[in-house]
């Protein structure tokens, strides 16, 4: 069955957005190691091509430059995936952007851009990929959300709201597509050692996160990728409509960060 094939099956195909770096690239690497053929999509064409060339088996991967917020680009990219591989078994909606500003300083243009990428993108990619999955019996979709969608904090009005909405979109997708053989789940990462985190997390924020997370550390892109891989695997064949927090216990602890409670 499509999307539930045994690890290493030569026919299986995964589409990953935001795949040029970080969690997206780690996820592409995971799928390749599991025997999938992989389509890597990203808006940053040069970085995407360089990342794809550096993969261990680039012959089983294609790189497609795509802005997931634009329907024509999404549809064109998925058509190219079908031409190259003939099918799609898994879709990982990872592409995302963030604006870290107080509510009253966030412009409407910034708000709309975050919503366009973080929410419209998964909607459009699902609409484009799901019909292809149905041709071979179904598949699996994983949306990359965030603990910022589970908890509110300052400076995340657009980002946090977009991720909370993505979690509900996940449930809507799961309910509507489940009967068709497509499972949909979300992963809500906690702090992860990515380039974006290194740029926006000050030493004080990093120290507070380590103090608030029971495992006392940031996660790695590879750990998030393995979580995504599990949700796309036969081991998760009865998991549908769930949001899995991969956060070292941060959400369970209920401890906030003083550095993110400053006055806006």
Please state what every model-predicted region is.
Residues 146:
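Residue(s) in the substrate-gating loop at a strand-loop-helix junction
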Residues 102-103, 110-112, 209:
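Substrate-binding pocket helix/loop in short-chain dehydrogenase/reductase
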Residues 123, 217-246, 251:
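C-terminal substrate-recognition "lid" of short-chain dehydrogenase/reductases
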Residues 92, 178, 183, 239-241:
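Short, small/polar-rich loop/turn modules that mediate ligand/substrate recognition or access, typified
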Residues 2-5, 151, 240-264:
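Short C-terminal tail/terminal secondary-structure segment
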Residues 126, 162, 170:
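Active-site helix of classical SDR
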Residues 131, 175-176, 237:
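Alpha-helical segment proximal to the catalytic Tyr-Lys
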């Amino acid at each position: 069955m499509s999307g539930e094939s045994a690890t290493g099956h030569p026919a299986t195909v995964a589409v990953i957005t935001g795949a040029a770096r970080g969690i997206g690239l780690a996820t592409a690497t995971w799928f390749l190691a599991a025997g999938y053929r992989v389509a890597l999509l990203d808006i940053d064409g040069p970085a995407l091509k360089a990342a794809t060339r550096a993969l261990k088996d680039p012959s089983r991967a294609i790189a497609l430059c795509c802005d997931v917020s634009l329907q024509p680009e999404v549809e064109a990219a998925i058509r190219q995936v079908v031409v190259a591989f003939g099918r799609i078994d898994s879709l990982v909606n990872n592409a995302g952007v963030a604006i870290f500003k107080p509510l009253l300083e966030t412009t409407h243009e910034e708000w709309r851009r975050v919503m366009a990428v973080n929410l419209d993108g998964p909607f459009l990619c699902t609409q484009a990929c799901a019909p292809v999955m149905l041709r071979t019996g179904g598949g699996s979709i994983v949306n990359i959300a965030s603990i910022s969608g589970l908890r509110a904090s300052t400076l995340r009005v657009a980002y946090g709201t977009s991720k909370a909405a993505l979690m509900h979109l996940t449930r809507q997708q799961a309910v509507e597509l489940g009967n068709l053989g497509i499972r949909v789940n979300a992963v809500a990462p906690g702090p992860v050692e990515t380039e974006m985190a290194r740029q926006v997390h000050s030493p004080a924020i990093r120290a507070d996160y380590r103090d608030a997370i029971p495992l006392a550390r940031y996660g790695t892109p590879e750990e998030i990728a393995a979580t995504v891989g599990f949700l796309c695997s036969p081991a998760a064949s009865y998991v549908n409509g769930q949001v899995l927090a991969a956060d070292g216990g941060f959400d369970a602890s209920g401890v906030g960060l003083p550095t993110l409670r400053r006055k806006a």
